[in-house]
Design a protein with these regions (language model features):
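Acidic/histidine-rich catalytic cores of soluble enzymes
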Residues: 1-74
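A structural motif corresponding to the C-terminal end of an alpha-helix
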Residues: 1-3, 83-94, 125-126
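Conserved, mostly hydrophobic/aromatic
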Residues: 10, 36, 88, 97, ...
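Soluble or luminal CAZymes and related metallo-dependent hydrolases
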Residues: 17, 76-80, 111
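A general structural detector for well-ordered alpha-helical segments in enzyme core domains, enriched
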Residues: 24, 80-84, 103, 114-119
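A short pocket-lining beta-strand/turn micro-motif at the edge of beta-sheets
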Residues: 32-34, 68, 84, 93-99
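A short, acidic, flexible beta-alpha connecting loop/helix-capping segment that sits on the rim
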Residues: 98-108
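C-terminal helical cap(s) of enzyme catalytic domains, especially alpha/beta-barrels
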Residues: 108-127
Length: 128
């Protein structure tokens, strides 16, 4: 990591593995984070307890997976996203935050709208 290579912090990847994206922001600091993906994860209770998180089923098998990518707010609530974005800001990150929509439980445009609404509410300052 340096001026030419930095981290694309995708919170969802840490989430499904049991990591803590907020702790990762504190550890990495803004000088190592070059881009942030806003993507959420939901652990599926009916399966994850018995099978764990190392699910090898493809994303299209979402009804039987132990975890799934979901629209923002459908895995972690707005309060969590407020804290995540606030910590990014406190650490000095002011770069892009991109939505990545992979929620197959709803139409893509619905998921984008729901995620956008969560991001707008969670942002530490007003963006239009």
């Amino acid at each position: 990591v340096g001026p030419m290579v930095g981290m694309n912090l995708d919170a969802s990847h840490l989430m499904w593995m049991g990591g803590d994206p907020i702790a990762a922001v504190h550890k990495l600091g803004a000088d190592r984070i070059y881009h942030v993906h806003a993507k959420d994860v939901r652990l599926e209770r009916n399966y994850v307890g018995a099978d764990g998180v190392l699910d090898t089923k493809t994303i299209d098998k979402f009804a039987k997976r132990t975890w799934n990518y979901v629209a923002l707010g459908h895995g972690h609530d707005v309060r969590w996203w407020k804290e995540f974005l606030s910590v990014l800001s406190m650490e000095g990150y002011d770069g892009p935050i991109s939505q990545e929509m992979e929620d197959l439980t709803m139409p893509a445009l619905t998921g984008v709208k729901k995620s956008t609404d969560v991001l707008k509410e969670a942002m530490p300052c007003d963006y239009e």
